[in-house]
């Protein structure tokens, strides 16, 4: 089944999200990450519980110089409080969501965020100062198609 068909099945009403990974101070191109993100979870820094639920899909976005959407992952858990959360530590996340990757490219091999911007919304502006935003069906279909093309080469 194509990725679009998996994510947008009529019998399965799940949400799709654009989720920032990394930061301006520590982008995914930082030597520590080696241009990849392959953790088994996605972290959320704010103390308010994220709306993401098990079965939802997250398109991972590196906002640094690449402005690249490089992965799509399925949430395999609801948000859980991170037992290692430390408010004194830069980048420590209050919530974690476990994920399974459907596509996970090196950051520099992803698609530019402008490639899925539609007439209805400029995603670059919408995601500013947010950790994640819900995507429209059109936006997530575009992201699926373009990521699959990148994967096939």
Please place each PLM-identified region on the residue numbering.
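Compositionally biased, charged N-terminal/linker segments
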Residues: 1-54, 63, 118-121, 135-153
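Residues in flexible loops and secondary-structure boundaries
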Residues: 27-29, 52, 68, 77, ...
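Short, Lys/Arg- and Gly-enriched loop/turn segments at beta-strand edges
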Residues: 66-72
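Alpha-helix boundary/interfacial micro-motifs
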Residues: 72-73, 79-80, 148, 153
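Aromatic- and Lys/Arg-enriched surface recognition patch
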Residues: 74-138
């Amino acid at each position: 089944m194509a990725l679009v068909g998996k994510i947008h099945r009529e019998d399965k009403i799940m949400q799709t999200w654009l989720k920032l990974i990394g930061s301006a101070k520590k982008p995914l191109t930082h030597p520590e990450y080696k241009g990849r993100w392959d953790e088994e979870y996605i972290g959320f820094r704010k103390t308010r519980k994220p709306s993401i639920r098990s079965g939802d899909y997250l398109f991972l976005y590196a906002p640094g110089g690449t402005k690249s959407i490089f992965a799509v992952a399925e949430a395999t858990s609801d948000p859980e409080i991170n037992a290692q959360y430390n408010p004194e530590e830069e980048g420590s996340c209050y919530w974690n969501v476990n994920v399974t990757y459907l596509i996970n490219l090196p950051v520099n091999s992803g698609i530019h965020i402008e490639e899925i911007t539609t007439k209805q919304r400029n995603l670059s502006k919408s995601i500013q100062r947010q950790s994640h935003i819900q995507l429209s069906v059109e936006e997530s279909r575009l992201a699926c198609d373009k990521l699959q093309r990148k994967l096939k080469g």
